[in-house]
Amino acid sequence: MGATLRELSWQGRPLISGFGRRDLPFGYQGAVLAPWPNRLANGRYRFGDKELQVPLTEPERLNALHGLVAFAPWKVTTTEPESVTLTHRIWPQRGYPHLLDLTAHYRLGEHGLTFTLTAVNAGDTAAPYGGSFHPYLVAGAGSVDDWTLQVTAERYLRVDPDRLLPVELAPVAQAGYDFRAPTSLAGVTVDHAFTDLDFDDAGAATLRLLGPNGRGVAMSWDRSCPWLQLCIPNEHNPTMNRKAVAVEPMTCPPDAFNSGVDLIVLPPGGTHELSLTISPLD
């Protein structure tokens, strides 16, 4: 279901919050997100000369959340001892009248697990597109409050408190979301997108999540994702309450189908690829 990453561990130590083979995932655990990540206000947008409406999948906030494929059936096309490839076709449908072919590829290597998502516009009209991946990272046993997080992002996206839709960009230091140095997550509540990320000479941005013993997990991603969503589940989600951190590199911010910010428009035959790696820290 959904080409979802269900479990990932290193030497018996979980690197993500997983779930059982017969269980439903919590809050998009390990999901592939396309053709848009995050929230689309009212499920409504304009593309070209058409006003379009997709179903509301977060009805309590009047949003369409995380695209169309997170709970769709994908086809396993190739398997190797260290890799698997899955594919899914988005057929033209209500609110998204486009034909997209998606390929999700997972590969285990010496640096960890690398995930690649490729989108190809198989239709004959241009298509709006955004993508992301939604694992919940864990730095060991215990609570998020015992961990530290580091990611170099200069600005975050303020959201309205009721619908969690974008309001404006602000410096991270203005709201206690400055993780440019290793920062304790004790008492921190966050469900925001970050940008102005620091990409190194190899073109990678990196987030590090460490437990009190100095062990943890890292995620690195390429320039195809200039945005990062961070979310710490709270008491409203008792099964995951402060037990993991959702880390979601995104090609675009929330509601990009309306704002146009970093929105990808795939021409017929056009291709987009994003890639990230989850690695253990010892």
Task: Give the role of each language-model region.
Residues M1-E51, T57:
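Acidic-aromatic substrate-binding/catalytic surfaces of carbohydrate-active enzymes
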Residues P55-E110:
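Extended, loop-rich substrate-binding clefts of extracytoplasmic carbohydrate-active enzymes
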Residues Y45-Q53, L117, V265-L281:
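Short Pro-Gly-centered flexible turn/kink motifs
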Residues M1, H88-A141:
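Acidic, contiguous internal or C-terminal segments within carbohydrate-active enzymes
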Residues W74, T103-H105, D196, V261-L266:
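Beta-strand-rich interaction surfaces with strong enrichment in secreted/lumenal proteins
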